[in-house]
Amino acid sequence: AAPLAHAASVKQEIPAQWDMEADVVVLGAGGAGLMAACQAHDRGAKVVVFNKGGSSYHTGTNLCGGLFTACGSRMQKADPKIKDDWKAFADDIIAYGEHMSLKEPVYGFTKHSGEAFDWLEDHGLAAHHLEPYAGHTNVRAHRQDSFKGRDYIDVLEKEIKARKIEVHHRMPVVKMYFDEAANRVVGVQCGRDGKFINCRAKMGIVMATG
């Protein structure tokens, strides 16, 4: 996170010519990044993903023990004993983080978490179940029967390949290019060991770096 914060804080001269461009640039190829890439693609965007690690299987999602907390999924709604809502879910997350979280991204996640889990189910997610989990006032932990986070990555990798979305591994972000006139980040430089790519992001950048 520190190198990325440094990259974002230093004014960078925008390249006169880009090496490549996409509508949406996703940084990070774990569960959040690959899901974002699929969703942007399905809404008509050209997407490219840059990942610091060597594989999507070298990410936090793969190491999560097959756990996905979600509110409003089909599985949760099917249990009549569970009465849950996105605001209660958000309150649990914010309390667990000692009220230091920004509410907007937490609300965005909790409102759409059930929909996201249903999407994984619809695209072939392996067997799973519901269970209680520490810090949550309701039963919303969806756990893979395998206890392996790679079940999620398996689904997402399959869908990324089906959509022919470019994923560049071992390509950490080292610069962000900010256009003062447009008042937004318009591109990134990714790479290492003297080999770098300047990629324009015509619509935006998704930060999913953990």
Predicted features and spans:
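Beta1/beta-strand and adjacent pyrophosphate-binding region of the FAD-binding site
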Residues: 16-32, 48
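Generic hydrophobic/aromatic pocket-lining and core-packing "Φ" positions
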Residues: 34-37, 117
